[in-house]
Amino acid sequence: MFRLKQLREERKISQVKLAMDLGMDQSCVSRYEAETRKADYDTLIAIADYFDVSIDYLLGRTDNPKINH
C-alpha cells in the first residue's frame, strides 16, 4: 500500500504493534508495505480506519487524507 509505511512511521508504530492491533501477522504488514501482497477490501477498510484516513489516501489516489462523507 502506497502510504502504509509512511503513516505507520509518522505515528511511531511498529509493524508488530500494527499487526497485533489489526489481528494479522507482522509478515502481512511487511508485505503490504513492500507491495508484494495486495490487501482485500475489508483489510483496506480496517487500515484506513486505524489511521483515520480514506482508502484513496492510503492507496495514493489523493493527497487529501480526510474521509469525505
Role assignments for model-derived ranges:
Residues 1-10:
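A short, Lys/Arg-rich alpha-helix, primarily the initiator
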Residues 9, 20, 49:
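Alpha-helical residues within the helix-turn-helix
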Residues 10, 59-69:
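Short, charged recognition helix plus adjacent turn
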Residues 13-31:
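Short alpha-helical DNA-recognition segment
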Residues 23, 42-57:
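DNA major-groove recognition helix of helix-turn-helix/homeodomain DNA-binding modules
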Residues 33, 51, 59-62:
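DNA major-groove recognition helix of helix-turn-helix
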